[in-house]
Amino acid sequence: MHNKFLLLILFLFIPNIMLGKNYMMNCISPDFKKAAFYKFDSTNKKLLMRTVKKKWKDFCDFDTEYEQNIDCTFNKLNIIRSSTIENEQDYLEKYLNINFTKYSLVETIKIFKNSNLKEKIDNIYKCKKVNI
């Protein structure tokens, strides 16, 4: 009797555990100045971001530092967020490659001066999986 009950419970709950639709990770910048949590809902294709002591915000709509042309591309568990930040003659192109299979985040910043590429910076964040 008890064995059948345990098998029934396992049969009901294991598919939900195995087919998890939400993924979460915590990432810290290489200089340890920025830290954020990232949560990805793969069924709704929604990426949420939360810094320490702040509320969850939709990362694909949220403007972090006067960004323009924010765009998110979803490819299974890999999300690429691109944006531009314009100054008078300069502008930045910022790309965030967030990978929930490897639990990694790579930030690529391209600095343009007078429409010419001046500098390219790659920041590899230290990320850790957070169990939900």
Language model: regions and residue ranges:
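Residue-level signal for mature regions of secreted extracellular proteins and peptides
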Residues: 20-21, 53, 65-66, 120
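Ser/Thr- and Asn-enriched, surface-exposed coil loops between beta-strands
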Residues: 43, 62-83
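Short, solvent-exposed loop/hinge segments that bridge or flank secondary-structure elements
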Residues: 24-49, 79, 83-100
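N-terminal glycine/threonine-rich, aromatic-flanked beta-hairpin/loop signature
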Residues: 35-65, 103-115
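Classical Sec-dependent N-terminal signal peptides that target proteins to the secretory pathway
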Residues: 1-21
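Disulfide-rich extracellular modules and peptides
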Residues: 29, 62, 74, 129-130
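Edge beta-strand at a domain terminus
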Residues: 111-132
